[in-house]
Amino acid sequence: MAALRVSRLSWTSSRITANTRLGDGELVDIQREVKLGGSIHSKGVLILASFLASRYAAEQPLSLGASLVFEQTYGQVEGDSASVAELCALLSSLANAPIRQSLAVTGSVDQFGRVQAIGAVNEKIEGY
């Protein structure tokens, strides 16, 4: 399991955890499964799954199962600004390499693994 604290657009921060294991290539978005993930957030997780599959399963099926969750978040999660943090948490879990909890991360990732430009920078910094 890997954990990473992420600064959300609002005035709070959240802890994202990832769990990886042997599996069939499925990336479970727990927020979506319990109907707490909005469509843009779900799109971001699907993009992560596409990136992981293209990077690590180009020649053979991905024998990995993974899950992602915003810990102790009970309201709707929306937007793709946490996808960099989610990717970091997944890679941390895969490598069994903990991430320092003093870091704040925001931003989205495209399906090629490239970090994209972020918006509302001032609000995110002030909110953290």
Where are these regions (language model features)?
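Short, flexible loop/turn motifs enriched in small residues
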Residues: 9-13
